[in-house]
């Protein structure tokens, strides 16, 4: 795995993917299956209408509004709808809260079920067989070795297996020292990885 298959050459992987996508895009346009305007619209959707920035919006709302947090943990899909967030791959979302006693991490062992509306497209490592199998067997060791995140021995780790029926999202703990911060400032601390559970929200 870590030659680093999880974290390994994100740049290299990205270059390969970009080249393949461009080749496929050109072929589909040439065959009249897609148009450039259709492709631009899809890019706009994934840039502005779904993605981690929307997940961060949900997290910050939960950090700053206790009543919203209760609703989010009770029914994540409906609570997200309050913020205008939902849609494809977001029909059934369950949010699980990190606390001083327990840390949650998400995987999809069968395929790559993933809450697109709040996290965007899944990172490559999330779909790797090595991540999917190892996080179930030895989550503490994997988080430390692959993501540089050491969960204290006293803290329980729970692994949640997403499926087409239920997609899990982690509500990270709010970092200390952020009292009085604006929602915009708090949102900068929330990462896609922290909502999957492979790292905490950014420290202040």
Swiss-Prot record:
Sites bearing Cysteine sulfinic acid (-SO2H), chain numbering: 111
Q: Is Metal-binding found in the keyword set?
A: yes
Instruction: Report the cofactors.
Output: Co(2+)
Keywords, ordered alphabetically: Cobalt, Lyase, Metal-binding, Oxidation
Residue positions where Cysteine sulfenic acid (-SOH) is found in the record: 113
Q: How is the cofactor bound?
A: Binds 1 Co(2+) ion per heterodimer.
- What is the enzyme's class at the highest EC level? lyase
| InterPro entries hit by this protein | CN_Hdrase_a/SCN_Hdrase_g_sf, CN_Hdrtase_a/SCN_Hdrlase_g, CN_Hdrtase_asu/SCN_Hdrlase_gsu, Nitrile_hydratase_asu
Q: Which Pfam families does the entry link to?
A: NHase_alpha
Residues reported to bind Co(2+): 108, 111-113
Please name every pair of cysteines joined by a disulfide bond in this record: none
Name the Gene Ontology biological process terms: nitrile catabolic process
Say which family it is in: Belongs to the nitrile hydratase subunit alpha family.
Name this protein carries in UniProt: Cobalt-containing nitrile hydratase subunit alpha
